[in-house]
Amino acid sequence: MTDRLTKEQRHRNMSAVRSKNTKPELLVRKYLFSRRFRYRLNHPRLPGHPDIVLKKYRTVIFVNGCFWHGHDGCKYSVLPKTNTEFWENKIQRNKERDIREQKELADMGWHCITIWECQLKPVIREQTLESLAYTLNHIYLNDRSVKLYEIQEDNQLLAAESDCDYMKENLK
């Protein structure tokens, strides 16, 4: 099957596909800002240049397109019928890169959240975004909760000792 578009038309279409400021990313950013979460965009020093970085929460958010990042089981993640081998390899490499970068971030102590494009469709958008806010608050509280220390039980009595030599002498 041949492509319906000329090479120049296809090039123009593909060059219009953005990697930053996509509609799903803007939806998440607008929601976070309205809930007073403050963030940075595409931090250059972190692996994978996460879409959204919340330093206060030690959390990064990736807003992934279902097609480009190979969302398993999603109806929007369908391979094109032409040049399928190329697209399979490309999407597989993207998935491997995503896993590698998230592991690197986790090793650095960052929490990683992935939001898929299909989770921001109007039917479930509010539920997804509220779940995101809940998760961020949960992370914040867990990281900053009071850490209980363990009391080591030893057999030495230090205060109010019951077996003191001077007490034994006075009792005689």
What are these regions (language model features)?
Residues 1-114, 118-172:
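Nucleic-acid endo/exonuclease domains
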